[in-house]
Curated annotation (Swiss-Prot):
GO terms for biological process: tricarboxylic acid cycle. It comes from Blochmanniella pennsylvanica (strain BPEN). This is Probable malate:quinone oxidoreductase. The keyword Flavoprotein applies. Its cofactor is FAD. Pfam families: Mqo. InterPro entries: FAD/NAD-bd_sf (IPR036188), MQO (IPR006231). The lineage of its organism: Bacteria, Pseudomonadati, Pseudomonadota, Gammaproteobacteria, Enterobacterales. One of its GO terms (molecular function) is L-malate dehydrogenase (quinone) activity.
Length: 515
């Protein structure tokens, strides 16, 4: 196909300015990872990334717009559900999240081996993951959770304690100044990690740019995606530097534009998006760089969300490693705006509303009134209120040491359930066109940590005829040694994989053992 062509398609005159095998919308961790997979699997494919901002990884992937937790379900209590009827703890989601993160680590280890990623410590470092609770009921839950998780080899090495001095040894900051009569408990997983997804994204894109078949266009705003009779897609773009309009014809489209994915998916007109809506929620964190405070805490400590609060509100006080510097952050504190992106438009929410999703979003609002009350309470919160919440995790806090930082926007999914009623769904979800040539990623956490599992899902949907070929299978096994296998329940494989990834990524290896 020539660079410029004029085609009469469905009675509309279209000026095709370029063509590609696949267009990736958004220059964040998802598109960068997808682009790297495709470059390895099909080096001759023409891959285009379009990003509306002047730099990549400036929205959810930016280091200041997420907490950097390598989500492995070691410390996040919302990945394990307590069943009041039989007093059991369901760990199925924790296992799924953990396996997904192990898959991401394998791919990163492979990229280190082939010199695509050169300095692992620039994007991943060991920071122990801890859960910390107080009160009789919460302590009971954490103990049951710990006992349930030990039934999986994936959580071998987790330690539980109710001893104040033991917990103080792990992280003095959360214990010093605390009432010694308070009932507390904690779990600790030494092999937890802190991940800089912004640095990882930048390194992937820097390597991709060496491929002559890869093109990245910054300050290019994708405004719509339209399908053609021949199963191709026209991606309509505005060059924000000169306001020129462009149209790119492509065989495949992936929309990895964070909060904007829903709006762009709606322009495609595919019926699969009918009924989907989005609910934007932002976040803020208290941050300190004071070395006297930072040195008292080397952990990501997750607590338990308050009653009626959503999963995304789980408070945590974290060590973060940014360009070699350690800082602490505490939060999140919810914010609300109608923007779907941090650098988005106030009209994003309103542009996403249509006849297919107005009813579902109203139903979800009625059914989640507790969430609305929670958001209101967060919006009227004063800085001293925030410090009071921090004091529950850091009893001797000095307010003058902490600064409030605004993080990124997340768009929670609203969709119809089996009863055709709109429900609020936390997490991430891939929406595909019927023929698999267009896919979009919607939702939020634990997205970035599970990026490679999501890409494998996309490959299976979009390139089903290729993923089962010997050529692709062999390459995928090279990239992900546990590909097609389950880690849970396989002690030998878990240790083999973890030893491999830890060696490559310069992380601490702890041998898993049978109970």
């Amino acid at each position: 196909m020539s660079n410029v062509a004029v085609i009469n398609q469905q009675h509309r005159l279209i000026k095709i300015t370029s063509s590609a095998d696949i267009v990736l919308i958004g220059a964040g961790i998802m598109s960068a990872t997808f682009g790297m997979f495709l470059t390895i699997l099909e080096p001759t494919w023409r891959i285009h990334i379009y990003e509306r901002l002047s730099q990549p990884a400036q929205e959810s992937s930016n280091v200041w717009n997420n907490a950097g937790t390598g989500h492995a379900a070691f410390c996040e209590l919302n990945y394990t559900q307590y069943n009041n009827k039989n007093c059991s703890v369901d760990i199925s989601k924790a296992i799924a999240v953990n396996e997904a993160f192990e898959i991401s680590r394998q791919f990163w280890a492979y990229l280190v081996e082939i010199k695509v990623l050169k300095y692992p410590s620039s994007f991943i470092n060991n920071v122990p993951h801890m859960s910390f609770v107080w009160g009789e009921e919460n302590v009971c839950f954490l103990k049951k959770r710990f006992q349930a998780l030990l039934n999986s080899v994936l959580f071998s090495g987790m330690v539980y304690s109710e001893d104040l001095q033991q917990i103080r040894q792990w992280t003095p900051l959360i214990i010093d100044g605390r009432n010694v009569s308070q009932k507390i408990a904690a779990t600790r997983m030494e092999m937890g990690t802190d991940v800089n997804f912004g640095a990882l994204t930048q390194q992937l894109l820097n390597e991709l740019k060496k491929n002559v078949n890869f093109k990245m266009y910054l300050q290019h705003d994708v405004v719509s995606v339209q399908n053609n009779n021949d199963a191709t897609w026209d991606v309509h773009v505005i060059d924000r530097r000169c306001k020129h309009k462009k149209c790119i014809r492509t065989n495949y489209v992936f929309i990895g534009a964070g909060g904007r994915s829903l709006n762009l998916l709606q322009t495609s007109g595919i019926p699969e998006v009918y009924g989907y809506a989005g609910f934007p929620v932002g976040g803020q964190f208290l941050v300190t760089k004071n070395p006297k405070i930072v040195e008292q805490h080397l952990a990501k400590v997750y607590g338990k969300a308050s009653v009626n609060a959503p999963p995304m509100s789980v408070p945590h006080i974290d060590t973060r490693i940014l360009n070699g510097e350690k800082i602490l952050l505490f939060g999140p504190f919810a914010t609300f705006s109608s923007k779907f992106l941090k650098y988005g438009s106030w009209l994003d929410l309103f542009h996403s509303l249509n006849k297919h999703n107005v009813i579902p979003i109203l139903q979800a609002g009625i059914d989640n009134f507790d969430l609305i009350k929670y958001l209101i309470s967060q919006l009227v919160m004063s800085n001293m209120n925030r410090i009071d919440e921090l004091r529950e995790y850091y009893p001797t806090v000095n307010p003058s040491d902490w600064t409030l930082v605004t993080a990124g926007q997340r768009v929670q999914i609203i969709k119809r359930n089996s009863n055709r009623r709109g429900i609020l769904q936390f997490g991430t979800e891939v929406v595909n066109s019927g023929d698999g040539t267009l896919s979009a990623l919607l939702g939020a956490s634990p997205g970035a940590s599970t990026v490679v599992s999501i890409i494998l899902q996309l490959l299976n949907t979009m390139f089903n005829n290729k993923i089962n070929s010997d050529v692709w299978k062999n390459k995928l096994i090279d990239m992900i040694p546990s590909y097609t296998k389950n880690l849970n329940g396989d002690l030998i494989l878990v240790n083999k994989i973890r030893q491999y990834t830890c060696n490559a990524l310069k992380l601490n290896y702890i041998e898993a053992i049978d109970r």
